[in-house]
Amino acid sequence: MKLPVIFSLLAWSLTMSAADYDLNKPFGFCTVTSRSDATCTYHVTGGGCYTYPLPDGFAGKVAVLTSEGPDADMEKSIENAIKHNDVVILDGSKGDFMVAGRVDITVGNKTLLGINGARLCTRWHMTADMRRVLDDAGVPQMDTHGGGGMLPNGARVREEAEYHTRRIFIEKTGDATESFRNAGVLSLRRCSNIIVRNISFVGPGSVDVGGSDLLTCTGSTNCWIDHCSFQDGMDGNFDINNQSDFITVSWCTFRYTERSYMHQNTNLVGYSDREKTGFLNTTFAFNWWGEGCVQRMPMVRVGKIHMLNNYYTSTSASNCINPRKNSEFLIDGNYFDKGVKKYYSQVDAIAVTWTANNYIAEASSLPGSMGEAVAVPYDYSVAPCSEVPEVVRAKAGATLFGK
């Protein structure tokens, strides 16, 4: 019989509320510029504020957008608003914001806030008919590591499952350009000092076509992604790569629904073993990996990663925390609920520190620390892991600034 493994549930004797743990301000790696020197601080301001209503006397440029309707592509409208304003507020009171492709943020010092239940959604999405055709072709049983070929449009694909999925979609849609692969929402591209808060990202459903993530951070630094919800990303929900650095992901939720098909791989940090070392330093704090998540919660190459008070409930998980080549992990105060059986594995990591303050409901063996003790260059407080389920369930996701 598997018995719960409880590690020092009372790290703090002081009982705190969810509001006490939610600092409502930037913290973690986004507030520094060094992976080891605490004196190298950074003041994350985004476009000058990050709360709503905006502070009295705020002098920055502000744009407030509402939905233009369920058939309108708002990709360029949102992109232009971000380019020409310091703060962009997405007001969900008139419905969802639909985008045909990723909104690119390529300039720094920007804040993007959602209010009134703002949702950024992809126009293209998987359907029951698409899933049925893929099932009939036997795609779930196909190789995901080799056995690909050349598509009718001349593109070469390495993996068998991806090759047949894309071939079927080209034939079914008649779209040789494969525009469906661009069904992502937001891309932070080589920019810095970015704040994104209180937005729900809704994707097309995960499917193995080498497509877009809901949110991608590429070569960007000092970004704070807070209180957002991510659902049904095509390739991933939120990936961080290409020498991005000093990122904090806090109070976010990640999940998949019946819209998703394969490749429920939610958070990748480092696109390959070839990532240049010294980058990708990231804090994941008070996040919730829930229904439908299978892998990459997160999977990381290269970076120093702080896993602080995160909550895991996905019973379909085949691997949750996954340190990979040249990564370092500090794992503190996390809670793996009943039904989460595959919670951790590492391959070629430099160092992993599991503190005493973690809870694993169905552990048959304890994960061991390895290498030198991992430390982070900023102050933080750890909630007792026993409080994580209640606190994270109450506060994580797009729960700020009105419904």
Language-model segments: what does each one mean?
Residues P4-S13, S17-V87, D96, M130-I168, ...:
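Extracellular "leader-to-stem" segments immediately downstream of a signal peptide or signal-anchor
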Residues E75-I82, M98-V107, T122-M126, P323-R324, ...:
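Short, T/G/N/S-enriched strand-turn elements that build extracellular solenoid repeat scaffolds
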Residues H84-I89, R119, I194, D245-F246, ...:
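Loop/turn elements at helix/coil->beta-strand transitions in domains of secreted/extracellular proteins
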Residues D96-G278:
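Right-handed parallel beta-helix
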Residues G203, D232, Y256, Y261, ...:
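Residues in short coils/turns that link rungs of repeat/solenoid architectures in beta-rich domains
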